[in-house]
C-alpha cells in the first residue's frame, strides 16, 4: 500500500463524511432505526457510509473493504483490508453529546497501521501520517490541504497517579472494578474512538474496555494510539489485540501508554 496516497484519501473522506453527518446532526429531527443486533442506526450513519465506501472503492479498487453498515463486507477473510465505522458513537450522536467520530483505518496482516479519527462536532482530527507518526491537525480543516499538525506522543505515566478514560455510554460495574485496581488521580469519560485519542495526546494514561466492541469501532483509534507510541492488548492475557477475526468481534481490551503497570483481569 502506498501510504502517501492512502492517508490524504482517508483524511478527505473523513472530512466529507463529517460534513454530511453534521448536516443531519444540526437538523431539527432525524429518524433512528434499530438494527438486528439492537444497536441504533441513523440516516447519518448510512449517508457517511455510502460516501466513504464509494470513495475508498474508487481510490483502491483492489483492496478489501469492511464497513459496519454493509453486512456483505463482513466475510472478506482477508488479513489486509480497509475498515470503516462511518459514525462511531451513534448514541452520542442521537443524544447530541458531540462525542462521535468518523473512523477509517488500514489493517495489514492483522495490525492497524494507518488510521484517521475525526470528531466533527468537537473539531478534532487525528491521523497517522504516511511515515506512521500520529498527528493532531488544527482546524479549520480544508478538504485538499492539510493544515498545521502537532506530532503526538503518549506521556510517561505516573503509576501512583494515573489518568483513566472510560466509556461515556457503556460504563459498568466490571469496568469500575478493574479501574479500582489502579491508583487513579482522575477520571475522564468520552464516547467513541476519542478515548484512544486521549491516551495518544497524553490526556489519559489508560483506557480499559470491559464490554462488547467490534473491529470497526477500534481499528482507527488503535492505529492513532500506536502511531503515538501507545499499545492495545487483550484484557485476559495482555497479548496484542489483532484484527481480521472471524465475525470481527473484539475481546475485552486495554489501551494504554507504555509504562503503565497493567493489572491482571
Predicted regions and their residues:
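N-terminal subdomain of lithium-sensitive/metallo-dependent phosphomonoesterases centered on the IMPase/IPPase/PAP
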Residues: 1-87, 173, 177-181, 197, ...
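Oxyanion/phosphate-interacting regions
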Residues: 1-12, 18, 177-181, 196-265
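Residue-level signal for inorganic ion chemistry
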Residues: 21, 45, 56, 90, ...
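Short clusters of hydrophobic/aromatic residues that line enzyme substrate/ligand-binding pockets
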Residues: 30-32, 41, 65, 134, ...
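Thr-Gly-centered strand-to-loop micro-motif
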Residues: 67, 166, 209-210
